[in-house]
């Protein structure tokens, strides 16, 4: 009944900003999953951030590792996945944190998943209001499926077209 089942060890870092402020960021998350005794299977995630915006730019899921209660670890295999993040930005409107692309690769660098995000019916990476008007999900090779949305002047979704080209219309009171 008093068995330990999970221990999570988070490592934090900080970037110094102006006026005595700091950006505090999670850099590592080591999870020790116990099996009701002293044996455990461990996983690790590491995170990298853009210094100017604080946006996460890379997340590495190391898969299974050998971890210790002190927070040290070593990689044990070839089950690592890396996700990179790009962002749509507009210095005119001070928009910096909307994702424009998320790409996951395996240990060998092969793409296993990708999503692209389009805002305000603009090209990828551009944004003025922040309304997500299209999302593309990678299927294989150069094939993507997409979801599209339209908005009214208040920023409310009016129509949504799913990946099978079926449209849902929304009305508001």
Language-model regions, residue ranges each:
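Non-catalytic interaction/targeting regions
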Residues: 1-173
């Amino acid at each position: 009944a008093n068995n330990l089942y999970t221990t999570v060890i988070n490592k934090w870092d900080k970037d110094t900003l102006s006026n005595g402020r700091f950006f505090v960021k999670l850099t590592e998350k080591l999870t020790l999953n116990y099996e009701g005794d002293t044996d455990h299977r461990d996983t690790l995630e590491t995170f990298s951030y853009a210094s100017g915006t604080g946006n996460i730019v890379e997340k590495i899921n190391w898969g299974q590792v050998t971890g210790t209660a002190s927070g040290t670890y070593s990689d044990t295999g070839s089950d690592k996945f890396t996700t990179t993040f790009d962002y749509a930005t507009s210095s005119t409107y001070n928009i910096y944190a909307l994702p424009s692309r998320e790409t996951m690769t395996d240990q060998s660098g092969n793409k296993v998943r990708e999503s692209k995000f389009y805002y305000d019916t603009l090209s990828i990476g551009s944004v003025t209001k922040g309304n997500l008007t299209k999302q593309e999900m990678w299927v294989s090779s150069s094939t993507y499926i997409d979801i599209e949305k339209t908005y009214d002047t208040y920023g409310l979704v009016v129509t949504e077209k799913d990946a099978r080209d079926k449209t849902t219309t929304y009305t508001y009171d």
